[in-house]
Regions:
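Substrate-recognition/cap regions that form aromatic- and gly/pro-loop-enriched pockets
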Residues: 332-408
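N-terminal beta1-alpha1-beta2 module of alpha/beta enzyme domains
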Residues: 1-88, 210-213, 323, 355, ...
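Alpha-helix-loop-beta-strand connector modules within alpha/beta enzyme cores
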Residues: 68-95, 257-259, 399-418
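Hydrophobic faces of well-ordered beta-strands that scaffold small-molecule active sites
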Residues: 8-12, 55-57, 92-98, 121-127, ...
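Active-site mouth loops of central-metabolism enzymes
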Residues: 23-38, 97-106, 142, 147, ...
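Conserved, mostly hydrophobic/aromatic
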Residues: 10, 47, 51, 85, ...
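Internal, glycine-rich beta/alpha segment that forms the wall or movable "lid"
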Residues: 6-8, 104-226, 230-231, 259, ...
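C-terminal helical cap(s) of enzyme catalytic domains, especially alpha/beta-barrels
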Residues: 141, 145, 156-161, 246-254, ...
Length: 447
């Protein structure tokens, strides 16, 4: 029997005004929070006060829907936002999304390693592929198929990690007396003829106290799971029920072991929370926020997520089964699609699906603090998940409720830290400085 004590990990998703689509209309909320830097600073400080592992900022480099009745989800460039948060906080991890489809490895590697140094070793990169038509239109208009996207992603992640390691551990001498600053023999240069991007390196500066940033992945398709199993330290998932969560975690961990990983990735599904002093208060809060929802826009968003024609949908009827596409053929997130599809196959009406699921198909919890803590604990104790990426209904007051009311319960049960034990994100997550298998993948000789 293992003597290792598992530790619950919690992150906060900086989801614009909040996880609910109508959060921007909630009284007291800044409707333009998505590009208000002080909003993000306040949210990050709330998360750090609650001793959470990290804050997470998603990104789509496009306006992907009609903003006539809904503000964009996130607008500011993520690594710039997190650079500000790095100066306003001291311990909280800083995770940002950046696409492998519409970036170049050298620029991205440099940007995230700089963030890691500036923050004192608290940065992480959520590596995603991109296929949304709005984004494609901003980068030349050529749609890239899923297979090609993920092939590029695997090569991209390997190249970025190799660049992060390109300074080696003994390059800097910094001897003022002799005038020798560096021994360039220790540079770990890439062979341009052996990597897909013809990159040599090195980067313009060495790494941080945690070595290099944590790598996160969030794809639910077969190629996405493969990428996560091969390269990720942490995986963000969308699991609407425990059975799905268990199946997905078993699949990911088995594949990770096949790749020779010494440590399998941490699994953190998204969790949308509506918290009240009692269950009745929480239900009332959700009902009041739901009443602010633009159902026409919500139905359009659901149709896009499920890749079905919106004109074929009716609010008070189930989605016709013949309209449900093969998840392997859809352009959008497979994990989110599966959550919506499960509800559709239960015969739920479009209105019920919209009411049951917010924030792109993540699990939704409505209840008193004790109930939220109970559910988190029950999932964690199955071993299927290592924690959760918390998505409050309305970001600032929802995050405050989670930190002030739910976190103390988890602490009292011995599930969550009562103080930070380290200063870097690797220390918070318990991820070794070097994952031997992952580093082997990134070794310049293999590129």
């Amino acid at each position: 029997m293992s003597s290792v004590v598992r530790t619950l990990h919690l992150g906060l998703n900086l989801h614009g005004a909040g996880g609910h689509s109508a959060a921007w209309r909630w009284p007291g909320t800044n409707p333009s929070a998505f590009f208000d830097i002080e909003h993000y600073v306040r949210a990050a400080k709330i998360a750090e006060r609650g001793l959470l592992d990290a804050v997470f900022l998603a990104d789509t480099p496009a306006i992907s829907y009609d903003v006539t009745r809904q503000p964009p989800l996130n607008g500011l460039e993520p690594t710039l936002v997190l650079s500000v948060l790095a100066r306003e906080t001291t311990r909280i991890g800083l995770i940002a999304t950046a696409s492998t489809t519409y970036n170049e490895p050298y620029n991205l590697a440099r940007r995230f390693l700089s963030l890691d140094v500036i923050s004192g070793g608290r940065a992480a990169w959520n590596a995603v592929t991109t296929s949304s038509p709005a984004t494609v239109a901003n980068f030349g208009g050529r749609q890239i198929g899923r297979e090609e996207r993920y092939k590029r992603a695997e090569e991209f992640v390997e190249t970025v990690r190799a660049l992060w390691l390109s300074w080696g551990d003994e390059t800097i001498i910094a001897d003022q007396a002799s005038g020798v600053y560096a021994n360039t023999d220790h540079f770990r240069l890439l062979d341009p003829s052996k990597n897909a991007f013809a990159i040599r390196g090195p980067l313009t500066h060495p790494g941080s106290r945690q070595g290099y940033p944590i790598i996160v992945q969030a794809g639910g398709s077969d190629p996405g799971v493969r990428l996560a199993a091969r390269s990720a330290d942490v995986v963000f998932t969308a699991a609407g029920d425990l059975k799905t969560a268990i199946g997905e975690s078993e699949r990911l961990r088995a594949l990770s072991r096949q790749f020779g990983r010494r440590a399998t990735p941490l699994i953190l599904p998204g969790l949308v929370t509506f918290i009240g002093g009692t269950e009745e208060e929480a239900q009332r809060r959700k009902k009041e926020i739901d009443a602010l929802l633009d159902l026409t826009r919500a139905m359009d968003a659901l149709a896009r997520s499920m890749d079905v024609p919106v004109e074929k949908l009716s609010l008070d009827r189930p989605i016709p089964e013949e309209l449900l596409p093969d998840p392997h053929n859809i352009a959008f997130s497979v994990g989110h699609h599966r959550t919506f599809e499960a509800l559709a196959r239960e015969g739920r009406t479009v209105r019920e699906i919209i009411g049951s699921v917010q924030a792109f198909g993540h699990r939704l919890l409505v209840g008193a603090p004790e109930q939220i803590a109970d559910s988190i604990e029950s999932w964690f104790r199955t071993g299927a998940v290592d924690g959760f990426n918390i998505i409050p209904d309305v970001l600032e007051d929802g995050a405050t409720a989670f930190v002030d009311l739910v976190v103390p319960i988890l602490q009292s049960r011995g599930l969550f830290r009562t103080e930070y034990q380290g200063e870097t994100l690797r220390e918070h997550l318990g991820i070794p400085h070097h994952d031997v298998a992952a580093e082997t993948l990134a070794r310049p000789s293999s590129l």
